[in-house]
C-alpha cells in the first residue's frame, strides 16, 4: 500500500486540479484493490482442491515466464507469480477520444509516462460518465474493457481472473504483450509502445507454439495473425480516407457528410470481408458497432507500427537479442526520426513479407 499512497501524495502535491485529484484517487484505490488479496501461484498449485483447468493455466504461466526469459530475452522479474480474482470481467475500462473532424486521438498527461492517448478507470460507470462528458463537448469517444495492464515495474503484476480463462495462445499473447512493456516503454509515444508489444507478443506466441505445441498449432496461429493483419489494414484504409477528408478544403458540413459516407463504405467492406472466408466471420461484429475517429484511432495505436517491427525482426535474422537491441536504439531517437525509421521498415514489410510473421 505504501507505494500507492506515495504515488497519490506525489500527484496531490503537484498542484493538479480537483478533477485530476479525483481521477488519481480512483486510480490509487483501483491499484490497491489489485494488490490486496493476491495469492501465490506456487502455493495454489499445491492445493488438491484447485480445479485441474486452473492448475494447468498456472503451470502454463510459469512456463511462459521462463520462455520469455530464455527465448524472448525479456526478464519477467516477479510478474505473474501471483493470482488475483477481482470478480469482474475487466480490470480497467479505457476511454479514447478524438475531435469530430480529426483522426488524431486526444491525449492526457500522466506522471512518469507523460502523454498518453487514453484514460483508464477501474469502475465502468466512471469511464462511461467521463466519456459522456467528452461526447457532450462534441468529441468522438470509444470505451473499451481491458483485461490487463502493465504497471511498468512499479508493482509486480499478477495473473487476473479477467484473462485466466483465455485460450492458450491468447493467454500467452497477453502475458508476452505486458512483459514487452516491462522490457521497454518510452514516454509520450503510445503507438510505438503498443505496436512494439503487439509485435513481440505475436512473435513470441508463434515461437512458443512451434516449440511446445507443434507445427499445426503454429500454422493455425499464423493464419489467424494474417487475418488480424488484413482487418487492421482495412481499418487503416478507412482511417486514412477520413484523414484526407478532414485535411481537405471542404466545409465542415461537407466533411460531416463525407465522414458518414466513408464510415458506411468501410462497414460495407467489413461485411464483404466477413463473407469472404469462414475465418473472417467475426469481422461482421465490426460492421455492426459504432465506428468513429476514436475507435479507429485506438485500433491504430495497437497495430499501426506492427509491420515495421516484424520487418525489423526479419532483418535481425529473427534473433531476439539483436531485434530488441535495435528497437532500444530506435527508442532513444527523437520521435520524428523514430517515426521515419519505422516508416521505412513498414515499406520493407509490405514489399517482402506477405504474412505479418512469416516464420516458416
Predicted regions and their residues:
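Positively charged n-region of N-terminal signal peptides that target proteins for export
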Residues: 1-4
Amino acid at each position: 500500500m505504501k507505494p500507492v499512497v506515495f504515488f497519490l501524495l506525489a500527484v496531490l502535491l503537484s498542484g493538479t486540479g480537483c478533477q485530476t485529484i479525483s481521477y488519481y484517487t480512483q486510480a490509487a484505490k483501483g491499484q490497491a484493490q489489485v494488490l490486496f488479496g493476491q495469492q501465490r501461484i506456487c502455493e495454489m498449485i499445491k492445493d488438491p482442491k484447485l480445479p485441474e483447468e486452473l492448475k494447468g493455466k498456472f503451470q502454463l504461466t510459469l512456463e511462459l515466464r521462463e520462455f520469455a526469459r530464455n527465448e524472448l530475452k525479456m526478464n519477467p522479474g516477479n510478474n505473474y507469480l501471483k493470482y488475483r480474482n477481482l470478480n469482474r470481467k475487466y480490470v480497467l475500462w479505457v476511454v479514447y477520444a478524438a475531435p469530430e473532424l480529426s483522426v488524431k486521438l486526444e491525449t492526457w498527461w500522466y506522471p512518469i509516462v507523460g502523454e498518453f492517448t487514453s484514460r483508464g478507470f477501474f469502475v465502468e460507470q466512471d469511464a462511461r460518465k467521463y466519456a459522456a462528458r467528452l461526447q457532450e463537448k462534441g468529441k468522438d469517444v470509444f470505451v473499451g474493457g481491458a483485461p490487463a495492464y502493465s504497471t511498468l515495474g512499479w508493482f509486480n503484476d499478477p495473473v487476473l481472473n479477467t484473462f485466466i480463462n483465455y485460450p492458450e495462445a491468447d493467454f500467452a499473447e497477453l502475458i508476452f504483450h505486458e512483459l514487452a512493456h516491462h522490457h521497454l516503454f518510452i514516454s509520450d509515444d503510445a503507438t510505438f509502445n503498443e505496436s512494439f508489444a503487439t509485435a513481440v507478443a505475436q512473435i513470441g506466441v508463434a515461437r512458443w507454439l512451434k516449440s511446445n505445441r507443434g507445427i499445426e498449432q503454429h500454422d493455425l496461429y499464423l493464419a489467424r495473425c494474417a487475418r488480424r493483419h488484413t482487418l487492421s489494414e482495412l481499418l487503416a484504409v478507412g482511417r486514412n480516407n477520413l484523414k484526407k477528408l478532414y485535411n481537405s478544403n471542404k466545409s465542415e458540413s461537407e466533411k460531416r457528410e463525407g465522414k458518414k459516407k466513408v464510415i458506411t463504405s468501410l462497414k460495407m467492406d467489413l461485411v464483404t470481408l466477413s463473407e469472404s472466408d469462414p475465418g473472417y466471420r467475426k469481422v461482421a461484429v465490426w460492421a455492426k458497432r459504432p465506428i468513429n475517429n476514436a475507435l479507429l484511432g485506438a485500433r491504430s495505436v495497437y497495430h499501426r507500427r506492427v509491420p515495421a517491427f516484424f520487418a525489423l525482426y526479419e532483418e535481425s535474422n529473427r534473433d531476439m537479442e539483436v531485434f530488441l537491441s535495435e528497437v532500444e536504439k530506435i527508442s532513444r531517437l527523437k520521435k520524428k526520426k523514430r517515426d521515419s525509421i519505422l516508416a521505412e521498415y513498414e515499406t520493407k514489410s509490405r514489399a517482402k513479407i506477405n504474412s505479418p510473421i512469416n516464420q516458416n
